[in-house]
């Protein structure tokens, strides 16, 4: 999406690490946004998950935090319009969304956020890799583009 110029110019893409170690990358991003006095409308955390694999879902929405009811309605509308099978897990395993939703200080309150995950099969933390359904890639990319570019 980035290489093809399919993301709005207002979209900030940050590659973070250390999710398994207290989400240090997400904390660093929050601190940087605070220093730069950036107003952020939403954060989308991209990840893999075992949720939805057995249901053959193309993607899952997990750990949604801080969206108002109208924005939530618009997100559901986008999901329904996609016509793609997805799984919704309001409170899944902790991830970076928990950091983004807390904010970094009184200067930078929590950011509405969710995790957009690709369902996989296998040990996500092992050395053997995981299985990903090829049929999930295009719908995942499509909903990511729509969510990232959406103005709610």
Regions found by a protein language model. Give the residues of each.
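Acidic/histidine-rich catalytic neighborhood of metal-dependent amide-processing enzymes
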Residues: 1-65, 94-102
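Active-site-adjacent substrate-binding region
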Residues: 57-152
């Amino acid at each position: 999406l980035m290489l093809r110029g399919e993301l709005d110019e207002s979209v900030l893409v940050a590659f973070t690490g250390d999710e398994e170690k207290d989400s240090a990358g997400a904390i660093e991003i929050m601190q940087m946004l605070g220093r730069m006095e950036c107003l952020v409308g939403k954060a989308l955390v991209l990840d893999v998950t075992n949720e939805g694999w057995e249901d053959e879902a193309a993607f899952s929405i997990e750990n949604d935090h801080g969206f108002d009811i109208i924005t939530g309605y618009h997100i559901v509308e986008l999901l329904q319009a996609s016509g793609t099978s997805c799984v919704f897990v309001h409170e899944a395993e902790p991830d970076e969304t928990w950091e983004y939703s807390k904010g970094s200080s009184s200067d930078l309150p929590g950011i509405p956020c969710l995790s957009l995950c690709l369902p996989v099969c296998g040990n996500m933390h092992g050395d053997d890799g995981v299985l990903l359904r090829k049929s999930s890639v295009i719908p995942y990319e499509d909903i990511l583009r729509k969510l990232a570019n959406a103005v709610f």
